[in-house]
Regions:
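N-terminal catalytic or cofactor-binding beta/alpha core of small enzyme domains
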Residues: 2-422
């Protein structure tokens, strides 16, 4: 491949759409035709755009260029777009989606908002230092509306109808504690489920079954990724050194997909509800996984926190609460069947993140900053990831009912149900 050109560590103020479909020259389709157009790949942390309007604080004073530079270099997933493009090409895809907005300005991998002081890394919000404490309200609001919401809409369109979403990231060699990170890590479990056996209360609607957060992708695919890459001499970890924060697109995608599926199932059983404004209001609230709809937030607070609605909305909220209780009763009556049907369905939408260490695919300077991409190594890792997906689609996607009954998925580990703290 030859030596790659030196990287620029500079960001740009030249605006582009916050998310772009990056075209690639695809290889011939390497898996069954039924999976054509069922895979999407995205990169959300390799952007380089910081619009000029956000370089000054709420009083019009310039934000420190040094602080922005440090955050930009540290936060960016250097090389992720190269890896994603190579995977997309190998999988016969025509494009992947890349967020152009710099992560240090806006992190689409978190819930919208401004990070509170002292928040741990996995509990951050979308707007972080050095911008979190410098932007005025109007700036932060515009940033979310013109970037976060635009990215979200494009992602929704890209993901809808897909079977598999792959999020490509790169990370530093060392944890903040100084321990070395794995060369490659596959992330497919929600943080809250790992820590407490359930998602944090109030993040998503309680109707979402916590057990679905145990894994965001068929277990065989991470295992296939590990086997494929380990055979090629690349050590792989799973769900380490961290897990998926609840605000990650992968977890939000899982919750949205379940409620979208449940809506169709419920409406099949109760077709008279399909055009009801009250039921439409409830489904909109349940699928507001980005926490961006004001009316959904009001209904959520009305149902779960007994907040008083504005008087002119009182009847609409009361009707919506009745609809919510109907959906709740339906889910409880059919709990085991619904969860089992969805959880192990061959058509359950899947998503996972994959992390590749930055030092494996870059030459670094004495400060640990990327100087030049090492394309041969980056391509080898990307091809290994793609080959694992191909093998999974062509060989591993078999029905689950071939197991010995003794091995049936009925324990707390496998469900259905089994939420320990409910």
């Amino acid at each position: 491949m030859g030596q790659a050109p030196a990287l620029s560590l500079e960001w740009t103020t030249q605006t582009r759409p916050p998310i772009e479909a990056v075209a690639v020259d695809p290889d011939p389709l390497p898996y069954p035709e039924e999976y054509r157009d069922r895979i999407t790949i995205d990169v959300i942390h390799d952007g380089d755009v910081i619009p000029e309007e956000y370089l000054v604080d709420g009083r019009g004073r310039p934000i420190s260029r040094d602080a922005i530079d440090r955050a930009y270099i540290h936060e960016r997933d250097w090389g992720a777009s190269f890896v994603a493009g190579r995977i997309a090409r190998r999988l016969g895809l025509e494009c992947f989606h890349n967020v152009t907005t710099a992560r240090c300005l806006l992190d689409f991998g978190r819930f919208p908002g401004v990070t509170r002081p002292g928040a741990p890394h996995l509990r951050r919000s979308a707007i972080n230092l050095p911008f979190a404490d410098r932007l005025r309200f109007a700036q932060a609001r515009r940033l979310l509306e013109e970037h976060y919401d635009v990215i979200s809409k494009a992602m929704d369109e890209a993901i809808r109808g897909k079977l598999l979403k792959i999020a490509v990231h790169t990370y530093d060699r060392y944890n903040p504690s100084g321990t070395e990170r794995p060369q490659v890590s596959v992330i497919s479990r929600a943080l809250g489920y790992q820590m407490d056996g359930e998602l944090p209360y109030g993040v998503f609607d309680p109707l979402y079954p916590d057990i679905l957060a145990e894994f965001t992708v068929d277990r065989m695919l991470p295992s296939r990724l590990s086997l494929q890459l380990e055979r090629q001499g690349m050590p792989v970890a799973q769900n380490y050194p961290y897990l998926l924060p609840e605000g990650s697109p992968e977890v939000r995608h899982q919750v949205w997909s379940f409620f979208d599926w449940l809506e169709a199932r419920f409406q099949t059983a109760h077709p008279d509800t399909e055009t009801s404004p009250a039921y439409q209001f409830v489904w909109r609230m349940l699928k507001d996984t980005n926490m961006r709809l004001g009316d959904a937030g009001m209904l959520r607070a009305y149902i779960h926190r007994f907040r008083r609605p504005p008087s002119y909305y009182a009847q609409a909220f009361s009707n919506a609460e009745d609809a919510y209780r109907h959906i709740e009763r339906y889910l409880r009556r059919n709990h085991d069947a619904v969860i089992s049907e969805y959880r192990f369905s061959a058509e359950r939408p899947m998503s996972f993140g994959i992390e590749v260490r930055k030092d494996l695919i870059h030459e670094l300077d004495h400060l640990g900053r990327p100087v030049r991409l090492v394309p041969e190594r980056a391509a080898r890792i990307a091809d290994g990831i793609a080959d694992a997906v191909i093998t999974y689609l062509t060989e591993d996607r078999v029905p689950h009912d071939f197991h010995d009954p003794v091995m049936a998925r009925t324990s707390r580990w496998y469900g259905p149900g089994g939420e320990p703290n409910k």
